[in-house]
Regions:
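FAD-dependent flavoprotein oxygenase/oxidase catalytic domain
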Residues: 1-236
């Protein structure tokens, strides 16, 4: 479960932990990164210097690659939110997608009824997976924008520093979408159509996008080259 290289460099470890600490000297080395000509107030830095050793928790970001399966084999157990699709904070959308999951799942269970729980749960996942995968990608775009800001260009056009939150993200109604498309999506499951070949359900992701598997290594290479490849479709 890889994580972003800049975070690994701080602790020097790939170990997953809730209790990694970092010293104040390390914080001060990194505190002004990405701020351009601006810097933190010296008084803030003096406060950081006063923090006792081994008391600053380095809450690192661990990533899970997108997985189209969010359920147990019998689709009686399902994960939602970050358990199903982890988000970078830069996406500004992780909590929203978790709420959308809950609304979508509840709607599908109501439509399918207690006699069809596995089908209802599987239909919910199909209605959600590609959308969430695309929203996850937006987090990398925004992280690149925020962490490697070209401040000279921002002075000319401040909008260049504004994180992207396109219409296809905020306009979506997961309850309405589930009720309008449940039966069509459920039928693709009955017919054995792969989720990435469904063409009978309108997209709730960027118009024109064709799903392609991706992982953190792909995105990290793009970030290192300052070009995040979002794939086909209209992402704006």
């Amino acid at each position: 479960m890889p994580r972003r290289a800049d975070q690994v460099q701080i602790t020097g470890s790939e170990e997953e932990s809730w209790t990694h600490t970092v010293e104040s000297d390390d914080v001060l080395k990194n505190i002004d990164n990405g701020l351009g000509e601006a810097t933190w107030d010296p008084r803030i830095k003096e406060l950081v210097k006063l923090i006792p050793p081994k008391t600053i928790v380095n809450f690192e970001l661990f990533w899970r690659n997108p997985r189209p399966t969010w359920t147990s084999p019998g689709a009686r157990v399902v994960v939602i939110g970050d358990a199903a699709h982890s988000f970078l904070p830069a996406s500004g959308n992780g909590a929203t997608q978790a709420i959308e999951d809950a609304v979508s799942l509840a709607s599908c269970l109501q439509i399918g009824g207690k006699e069809n729980v596995p089908e209802a749960v599987s239909t919910h996942v199909r209605l959600r997976f590609i959308r969430c995968s695309c929203a996850q990608k937006m987090g990398f775009t925004n992280a690149e924008l925020l962490q490697h800001t070209n401040w000279e260009k921002v002075k000319v056009n401040p909008k260049l520093a504004q994180p992207k939150l396109p219409r296809w993200i905020w306009k979506h109604d997961p309850e309405e979408y589930a009720y309008e498309n449940y039966e069509k999506m459920a039928e693709t499951i009955r017919q054995g159509i792969p989720f990435d070949q469904v063409d009978t359900v309108p997209p709730n992701y960027p118009p024109g996008y064709k799903y392609e598997p991706w992982n953190i290594d792909d995105m990290q290479r793009d970030v290192d080259n300052s070009t995040v490849n979002m794939g086909s479709g209209d992402w704006d």
